[in-house]
Regions:
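Rossmann-like dinucleotide-binding core of oxidoreductases
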Residues: 13, 21-157, 191-192, 269-296
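Short, surface-exposed acidic
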Residues: 154-167
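Short, conserved catalytic or adaptor-binding loops enriched in Gly and charged residues
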Residues: 34-39, 183-188, 257-259
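Glycine/threonine-rich phosphate-binding loop and adjacent beta-strand/alpha-helix elements that clamp
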Residues: 218, 222-295
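Helical element adjacent to the flavin cofactor pocket in flavoenzyme catalytic cores
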Residues: 7-9, 13, 173-204
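Conserved beta-strand-loop-beta-strand element in the redox core of flavoprotein oxidoreductases
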Residues: 1-13, 41-46, 197-214, 219
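Short hydrophobic core segments
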Residues: 12-26, 60-63, 83, 198, ...
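Short beta-strand to alpha-helix junction loop
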Residues: 1, 63, 135-144, 169-181
Length: 296
């Protein structure tokens, strides 16, 4: 065809190639729960944080115990008076082993950039070694599960709470989470773990599937993102329809980057580019190099 024609608020553009670097986790998933929109207090998704809300001294409800929740719950426990955590399905969690680099290490990296490159390579290799435990290797999965169980046992002494936080599915079936401080936060006396889904909302009362009722002042939805239906896909029209229509039966591409029927379109962090065992930054860098080589 004649290339790509783009319509923007500042006018129309034409280009021979189009690179979509729109990100993947951009559209929050909001559950369809009776009464949710009528919640009596501040209500927001973790990706649309309302910084005007005062959390100090508040009773905070959090819906979800996935990747978003393990990042925000520890801080909410530090700030709020009480946190009620509604968990539909627990996740396997392994140590993140996060730490700050020392001043000496920073000086060494500054003096020898190759040392930083070697460290990055080592971290990549460590991530790749984790793939077997997520891809059906029974021995690797069993070893990883034992590590996750040991992590849980070391940080959660209460047997009943441990049981509630233990998944009933095989390691690797769902996204494995990394956290050093989520379990300690959940063991706090300022946290109530409700091991059932949110069924409905009545004013400021959260009604769980178990029938339990919890009063909260603020409600945070840590309910994830719509990652399989990208909003930009509805705006991109190729030879035979929109990208959303092309992907209606499932997102497919070559090398996670180029899509049949959409000439000179490149999608960064495209289908199957996101990883559960290593850094997506590495994937995006490889895609960017592929785009540059293709257009050179």
């Amino acid at each position: 065809g004649d290339g790509w024609r783009l319509r923007t608020p500042r006018g129309d553009l034409e280009a021979q190639a189009l690179v979509l670097a729109c990100g993947r986790l951009t559209e929050p998933t909001v559950p369809d729960i009776p009464g949710l929109e009528g919640f009596a207090g501040p209500l927001f998704h973790s990706a649309r944080w309302d910084h005007s809300v005062k959390l100090a001294g508040a009773r905070i409800g959090v819906v979800g115990t996935g990747a978003s929740a393990v990042q925000i719950v520890p801080e909410l426990v530090r700030r709020g008076a009480h946190v009620t955590l509604l968990q539909r399905t627990p996740a396997w969690i392994v140590p993140r082993e996060a730490r700050d680099y020392t001043d000496a290490e920073r000086r060494a990296f500054a003096a020898d950039p190759d040392a930083l490159a070697r460290l990055r390579s080592e971290l990549f290799d460590e991530g790749e070694a984790r793939f077997a435990s997520r891809s059906g290797d029974p021995d690797a999965a069993a070893d990883a599960r034992r590590r996750a169980e040991a992590h849980l046992a070391a940080q959660v002494p209460d047997a009943a709470l441990r049981a509630a936080l233990t998944p009933d599915y095989a390691f690797g079936c769902k996204r494995v989470l990394l956290s050093d401080d989520f379990y300690p936060a959940v063991t706090s006396s300022a946290v109530t773990l409700e091991a059932s889904a949110l069924a409905s909302v009545e004013g400021s009362t959260l009604v769980a599937a178990s029938g339990a009722r919890h009063e909260v002042d603020v409600l945070v939805l840590a309910t994830g993102f719509s990652s399989s239906q990208q909003p930009y896909a509805h705006l991109v029209r190729g030879e035979e329809g929109t990208l959303a229509e092309h992907w209606s039966g499932g997102m497919t591409s070559f090398a996670s980057t180029v899509v049949a029927g959409f000439p000179n379109l490149f999608v960064l962090d495209g289908p199957n580019a996101s990883l559960g065992h290593n850094s997506s930054i590495l994937m995006i860098e490889e895609q960017a190099e592929y785009v540059v080589r293709s257009l050179a």
